[in-house]
């Protein structure tokens, strides 16, 4: 389960970077050249999704929980926003859902 969770975090990071770089270009006036690493990051994201050992719908559902946590870490580290109790509680609920889905992969 640890390997799967780490793979989910890598997948989420690739997706967030792939979306953040165009955001910098569109919202902050950064270089259009950021679109190239953004596209590469999104290709990595898609490839990483294929490495998960379950049906795509289950992978996407479970991945959502890890994405929430990764996005909140990004919010704190990159955006410099302090997380609230609600952020932590929501992330905990999302991660519990992910763990339940992943635990049932071999049983479904």
From Swiss-Prot:
Which residues span the membrane? 6-26, 29-49, 61-81, 85-105
Kindly state which keywords UniProt assigns to this record, in alphabetical order: Cell inner membrane, Cell membrane, Membrane, Transmembrane, Transmembrane helix
Report the NCBIfam families cross-referenced here: PRK02237.1
**Organism domain of life:** Bacteria
Q: How does it sit in the membrane?
A: Multi-pass membrane protein
Q: Which SUPFAM superfamilies match?
A: Multidrug resistance efflux transporter EmrE
Q: What is its main location?
A: membrane
Where in the cell does this protein reside? Cell inner membrane
Q: Which family does it belong to?
A: Belongs to the UPF0060 family.
Q: Name one GO cellular component term.
A: plasma membrane
Official protein name in the record: UPF0060 membrane protein ESA_01751
What is the source species?
Cronobacter sakazakii (strain ATCC BAA-894) (Enterobacter sakazakii)
């Amino acid at each position: 389960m640890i390997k799967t969770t780490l793979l989910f975090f890598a997948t989420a990071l690739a997706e967030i970077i792939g979306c953040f770089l165009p955001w910098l270009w569109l919202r902050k006036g950064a270089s259009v050249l950021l679109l190239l690493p953004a596209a590469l990051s999104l290709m990595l994201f898609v490839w990483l999704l294929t490495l998960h050992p379950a049906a795509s719908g289950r992978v996407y559902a479970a991945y959502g929980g890890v994405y929430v946590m990764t996005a909140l870490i990004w919010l704190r580290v990159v955006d410099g926003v302090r997380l609230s109790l609600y952020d932590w509680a929501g992330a905990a609920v999302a991660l519990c859902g992910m763990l339940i889905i992943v635990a049932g992969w071999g049983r479904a």
